[in-house]
Regions:
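Structural boundary micro-motifs
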Residues: 1-88
Length: 88
């Protein structure tokens, strides 16, 4: 199940996507992924996985940082419910 609806920006480097997540509280992913990456209310790097689980990661754990196909997305209503405790 895909946890995002709309793509707001595309073809971004991880560096740009990460800055948007961290500074603008946006959500990033890659076109081939169903979940997305975000920063929680405490500034921890998190990923909403395709199984609906949220895991904390470090930037060293992130795959495909060298790719330039990162996208900024809007979460689905279901995704917002799953991450609500992490962002509010």
């Amino acid at each position: 199940m895909k946890f995002y609806d709309d793509v707001l920006n595309s073809n971004l480097s991880f560096e740009v996507a990460n800055k948007l997540m961290k500074n603008k509280k946006q959500f990033a992913t890659r076109p081939c992924w169903d979940g997305f990456h975000f920063y929680d209310k405490n500034g921890k790097y998190c990923i909403l996985l395709k199984n609906g689980k949220v895991d904390n990661y470090t930037l060293d754990d992130v795959y495909d940082k060298e790719k330039n196909d990162w996208i900024i997305v809007t979460p689905t209503k279901r995704a917002i419910k799953l991450i609500n405790n992490f962002i509010k």
